[in-house]
Regions:
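Active-site rim segments in enzyme catalytic domains, especially the processed small/beta chain
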Residues: 11-26, 157-160, 164, 170-173, ...
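Accessory "access/gating" subregions that flank catalytic or transport cores
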Residues: 1-55, 169
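Short, well-ordered beta-strand elements
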Residues: 48-55, 61-66, 74, 180-181, ...
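Short Gly/Pro-enriched turn/cap motifs at secondary-structure boundaries
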Residues: 33-34, 40, 53-56, 169-173, ...
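Internal maturation/activation junctions in enzymes
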Residues: 5, 14, 23, 71-195, ...
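In a subset of proteins, long, contiguous C-terminal domains/tails are tracked
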Residues: 316-368
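Extended C-terminal subregions enriched in glycine
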Residues: 105, 186, 232-233, 266, ...
Length: 368
């Protein structure tokens, strides 16, 4: 398999620039790779421990956003209101800015600082009643290093089959990341987001019948960033499954396809269930939104300063109030955002539960 990949990547292929280039992955790279077991990064929010991947993924974004939001009044944590949606969006912008400045594989990521109460308080103090249109990473580990920011206006490519696989706003299926949650009667519980590539943007290796992964687009070619392309280093992916624990016992698993939106939609879910007391299915079905005011992880890696994508079910009054605060709102239709699924087990009664997203008919909850 490694030799077949080696032979294939040495063949020049046409790039979106119109020029032919060979790949850089070699059999020696694959031979040197070793899978690893890594401790989860955890933080407590309102009595629930939230466990995430390390900073080779974007998992700590969710933890950082929760740390910023935790001390606020419950009324400011309701994503269905203008006040709550504004506060959540602004917290996410700050957490995602730190992702761009500090997250990567194998480096000295200042996670302890980023997830600390003092740092969260300093970030919270940056939130005003107006929507920010700046990328504002904190000095968690010194002076932050960022790549050059680019807007969509700089790109007019008509190339298809590149960038992010997702469902169209209309619900049309064009492929997407996969996520799976499983729980059994004994309390074993798994959250997995195993996606790595997709056929429409990955060349297929004829000898193997499989496609190359495409996550390396999530590295930067500029030198000096936390996720600059380096040999032997994983890209800083968007894959970010979640486990929830209470009193040291696992109670739920959740996650979502959706690229940069994965932790954003999971944040809405956690606020609605932990703070709002909603059922899992109610929280999944509720109107969703996400910010685009940060560099995207998928080519061409642009950002929309102040951007906020909302489902129309947020309501005209809420949407107008968000626009009045300076958010650049894009309406995405009634049932277009969010791809969550979840399972759980009550550690006292042993009762299992599951819930899944109904949007685009791509999520299912099943038990036996």
């Amino acid at each position: 398999v490694a030799q077949a990949i080696d032979r294939f990547t040495q063949l020049p292929h046409r790039h979106s620039s119109g020029r032919d280039h060979a790949g850089v992955l070699r059999a020696t790279d694959l031979a040197a790779f070793r899978a690893s077991f890594e401790p989860a990064v955890t933080a407590s929010f309102r009595g629930t421990t939230v466990a995430k991947t390390g900073p080779w993924g974007q998992g700590p974004v969710l933890l950082a956003a929760l740390a910023i939001l935790e001390p606020l009044d419950d009324a400011l944590l309701d994503p269905s209101t203008a006040d709550g949606a504004h506060m959540v969006a602004e917290a996410l912008k700050l957490a995602l800015a730190d992702r761009e400045a500090w997250f990567g594989d194998g480096g000295a990521v200042p996670l302890e600082t980023i997830l600390s109460a003092d740092y969260a308080a300093s970030r919270r103090a940056l939130i005003s009643t107006r929507a920010s249109a700046e990328l504002r990473p904190g000095a968690a580990g010194g002076a932050p290093a960022l790549p050059r920011l680019r807007t969509a206006a700089e790109f007019s490519s008509g190339v298809t089959g590149v960038g992010e696989p997702t469902l169209e706003a209309t619900g049309d299926l064009r492929g997407d990341t996969c996520h799976l949650d499983v729980v059994d009667r004994w309390g074993n519980i798994v959250a997995a987001t195993p996606s790595g590539g997709w056929l429409q943007s990955s060349p297929t290796i004829p000898e193997l019948g499989i496609c190359l992964g495409t996550r390396l687009q999530m590295t930067w070619l500029e030198e000096g960033t936390a996720s600059t392309l380096r040999p032997g280093r994983r890209p800083r992916t968007t894959l970010t499954p979640t486990l929830l624990l209470r009193d040291g016992r696992a109670i739920a698993a959740l996650g979502s396809p959706g690229g940069d939106q994965q932790d954003q939609w999971q944040l809405l879910y956690l606020l609605r269930t932990i703070v709002g007391g909603w059922s899992p299915q109610q929280a999944i079905d509720a109107p969703a939104f996400h910010t685009t005011s940060f560099p995207g992880s998928f080519w061409p890696r642009t950002w929309e300063p102040g951007g906020l994508v909302v489902e129309d079910r947020m309501g005209d009054d809420v949407i107008r109030a968000l626009e009045a605060r300076g958010h650049v709102v894009t309406r995405a239709g009634d049932w277009s955002l969010g791809r969550l699924s979840t399972v759980g087990r009550d550690p006292v009664t042993g009762i299992l539960h599951a819930a899944a997203n109904a949007r685009a008919m791509q999520g299912y909850a099943a038990g036996r």
